[in-house]
């Protein structure tokens, strides 16, 4: 069974196998500090570690866009992908956000990320619109009432 815990500096070496591994040590420290302080760009931010038993499976970030709207997105380590961890972790993160008073979840998903599209649709997110993101990539904006 998986569970989520706030990240600590003890997790600094747990980024291997994720996109976060390419960050410098200074960037990792900065991100952890923002999570501990629960603020990024003057908005609520929290970075959670996804565990199964005592094994780090991946990470979950939560970012508030307003008092009621939050986005949360899992990053699952390569060796644990395609096993349902993303679904379980995001389900728990959405419950976590709802318990903190958020009423709407949003997700910006790259049009080419088929697994993330499938995940969000399975979780009941609805496609709100598409737009051009960085590098002219098409982004699908999903929305879900909590």
Q: For each of these PLM feature ranges, what is it?
A:
Residues 97-108:
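Conserved GNAT acetyl-CoA-binding A-motif
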């Amino acid at each position: 069974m998986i569970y989520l815990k706030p990240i600590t500096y003890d997790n600094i070496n747990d980024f291997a196998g994720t996109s976060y591994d390419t960050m410098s040590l200074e960037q990792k420290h900065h991100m952890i500090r923002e999570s501990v302080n629960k603020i990024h760009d003057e908005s609520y931010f929290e970075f959670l570690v996804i565990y199964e038993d005592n094994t780090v499976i991946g990470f979950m970030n939560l970012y508030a866009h307003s008092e009621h709207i939050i986005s949360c997105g899992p990053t699952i380590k390569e060796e644990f992908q395609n096993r349902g961890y993303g679904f379980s972790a995001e389900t728990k993160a959405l419950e976590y956000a709802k318990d903190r008073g958020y009423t709407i979840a949003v997700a910006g998903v790259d049009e080419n990320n088929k697994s993330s599209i499938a995940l969000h649709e399975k979780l009941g997110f609805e496609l709100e619109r598409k737009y051009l993101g960085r590098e002219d990539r098409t982004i699908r904006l999903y929305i879900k009432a909590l």
